[in-house]
Amino acid sequence: ASIFVNTAVSNEIIADINELSFPLGVISLAVLPAICEEVVFRGIVMTGYKKVSPFVAIMISSLFFGFMHQNLYQFSYAALTGVFLGFLVYFTNSIYASVLAHFIINGSQVVATKLALMDNSQAIMESLKEPLSKSDI
């Protein structure tokens, strides 16, 4: 069960993502989020709180990053990833390092998802559509 997002909505998102071609999936789920999210969370938020302390800046930007991902599982994973990315920026003094790491994390998930769905894509898409027809969306 999800705190912020209905599971049927999550299933619909997965089904939509599966419809993307591999290059479009990499661009829309790995390249663009890596650049945009890092500019916002490590570039703007973390830099803004750095005057308080680097640790506080990393923690606040990580919490915002976690909340932006919308459900409890994603929050936990994203917040911890945000801490890693924040320390990466802090120790390298470069947002490029966190953009690259973010791209590798998201890109590897796109590749893994596409590989996992290759053999079973039709069966998986049908199982995802079943809860959608029974949901209250």
Q: Which residues fall in each region the model found?
A:
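Membrane-interface helix/loop boundary segments of multi-pass membrane proteins
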Residues: 36-60, 87-94
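Active-site His/Glu-centered metal-binding helix of metallohydrolases
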Residues: 35-40, 44-45, 71, 104-108
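Juxtamembrane helix-loop-helix connectors linking adjacent transmembrane helices
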Residues: 1-36
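C-terminal membrane module of polytopic membrane proteins
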Residues: 104-137
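Alpha-helical transmembrane segments of multipass membrane proteins
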Residues: 31, 62-67, 83-87, 107
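Hydrophobic alpha-helical transmembrane segments
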Residues: 23, 27, 55-60, 75-76, ...
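Small-polar-interrupted transmembrane alpha-helices in polytopic inner-membrane proteins
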Residues: 53-70, 103
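Membrane-interfacial alpha-helical segments at the cytosolic side of multi-pass membrane proteins
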Residues: 31, 42-51, 111-119
